A protein has these predicted regions:
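Extracytoplasmic "Venus flytrap"
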Residues: 29-45, 69-72, 152-159
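Ligand-binding pocket segment of bilobal, Venus flytrap-like solute-binding proteins
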Residues: 69, 152-233
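Short, well-ordered beta-strand elements
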Residues: 25-36, 63-65, 89-92, 148-153
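Ligand-binding clamshell of periplasmic/extracellular solute-binding protein-like
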Residues: 46, 71-74, 87-100, 115, ...
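Hinge/capping helix and adjacent helix->loop/strand transition within the periplasmic-binding protein
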Residues: 21, 52, 56-59, 79-89, ...
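Early extracytoplasmic/lumenal segment of secretory-pathway proteins
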Residues: 60-75
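Bacterial N-terminal signal peptides
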Residues: 5-13
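Sec/Tat signal peptide C-region and signal peptidase I cleavage site
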Residues: 14-20
């Protein structure tokens, strides 16, 4: 996709020197989903190291996480796009999820191509999870279920929903989607309650949610299946290697029109955070791609 290529090209440091006056007050870091999900977890992990970076530059400010779920992430993106472009409101974005309006020609309340792109902070792959207490122990079990599967989800604008639709359409399995959950943690929990049969989450989230062994991980769409998922298969094993290309990018942006000086400062703070040894260790331990 041309728009995605353009976004990635923007995720590089600017050559203009950082402006010393920024930041002078707290920065709001908008999270487009509810607490407990992958975007929320990564943002909160980065924040202390961003604050550490700013303190080293002489700015003892706080970076404040602001959860703003709604409309599959579009509520937050519309808010951020209308914020003052002074660097004090930034957001973590779901790509390609937040770009679906642009791709399909629908009005999402913001123009994804006009945001000020600051840095890429993560990439992740998807797994299919079912309840360990249920009968769906494998993809074969799912495909042989004598009805459409029920899939709890955030909504039709989310990347995980798009991933689910790609996977089940490609595999030829009918699906009924149950929308309205505010985070991946919520719709994963819905599977345990029996609201639905299965759902898809990214690898890092699956490992966090499955510490007690409540879930079966029946598929991992990646060239190499994570050794932690002993019963999982990938797209290649299912005869659909193209499914192993389905993934998610986490990118940070601000409103349209931010100055290069402020953007460069935020880029440096995010780079410091994602390259911090403690965050890298956490990412390796939890398989969160940063």
């Amino acid at each position: 996709m041309r728009f995605l290529t353009a976004l990635l090209a923007l995720g590089v440091a600017f050559a203009t020197p950082a402006q010393a006056a920024f930041p002078e007050k707290n920065i709001d870091f908008v999270i487009p989903y509810g607490p407990g999900g992958g975007f929320d977890t990564l943002t909160r992990k980065m924040i202390p190291y961003m604050e550490e970076y700013f303190a080293k530059q002489g700015s003892k400010i706080s970076v404040v996480p602001v959860n703003m779920p709604g409309a599959s992430g579009n509520k937050a993106a519309a808010f951020t796009s209308r914020s003052k472009p002074d660097g004090y409101t930034i957001q973590i974005f779901n790509i390609p999820g937040h770009g679906l309006g642009y791709i399909t020609g629908k009005d999402s309340g913001y123009d994804i191509t006009k945001m000020t792109w600051i840095n890429q902070v993560g990439v992740d792959t998807y797994v299919v999870i079912t309840s360990a207490a249920g009968d769906l122990k494998s993809i074969d079990n799912i495909m042989n279920l004598g009805r459409d599967i029920k899939v709890p989800e955030q909504g039709p604008g989310s990347t995980s929903n798009m991933a689910n639709k790609i996977v089940w359409t490609t595999l030829g399995k009918g699906a009924e989607y149950i929308y309205g959950y505010k985070s991946s943690q919520e719709y994963a929990t819905a599977v345990l309650r029996g609201d639905g049969d299965l759902t898809m989450v990214v690898v890092g989230s699956a490992k966090r949610y499955n510490k007690a062994g409540d879930y079966n991980v029946v598929a991992h769409f990646n060239a190499q299946v994570d050794p932690a998922f002993t019963n999982a298969v990938n797209g290649a094993a299912l005869g659909k290697p193209e499914l192993d290309e389905v993934n998610l990018l986490r990118m940070v942006a601000g409103p349209p029109g931010m100055s290069p000086e402020v953007t460069n400062t935020l880029h440096a703070a995010l780079k410091y955070a994602i390259e911090h040894p403690e965050l890298q260790k956490w990412a390796a331990d939890t398989q969160n791609g940063v």
